[in-house]
Amino acid sequence: MGFEALSRGASHVTFVDKDRSCASAIKQSARQFKLEADSYEMISADFEKALSFFSRQGTSFDIIFVDPPYKMHLGGKIVQIVQTGRLLSNRGLLIVEHLPNELLDKIEVESYPQDSKLVPIDQRRYGSTSLTIFANALTVEE
């Protein structure tokens, strides 16, 4: 997805994968695509460590796309970490890929401050895969 985003005009993509062989494959693909070094970064880390790092740095993203291992049912946890870490820009989108039976639209968000609350705005199913898209609650209300 990151390479597709770059090909469609994204100025920068941050890849996160804890599997070193996947990280290596991403770097190799970037070289093959002749990407500018400042257009992407590859972080080899567990998603929780990476998101915590971004939060401490005050980094926010316009789009966060996550494709966690389905069997681990991490979608809800990721939404909560993105909310509490304030990792989305005001008009940003969080897109979570997950199993259709993982109900991410039912995540409890009432306890989060209004300016960091994420709400589901769309859900799509593609065969055995679902995508749930979240946005900042204040943006949705405008």
Language-model features, listed with the residues they occupy:
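Class I S-adenosyl-L-methionine-dependent methyltransferase catalytic core
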Residues: 1-142
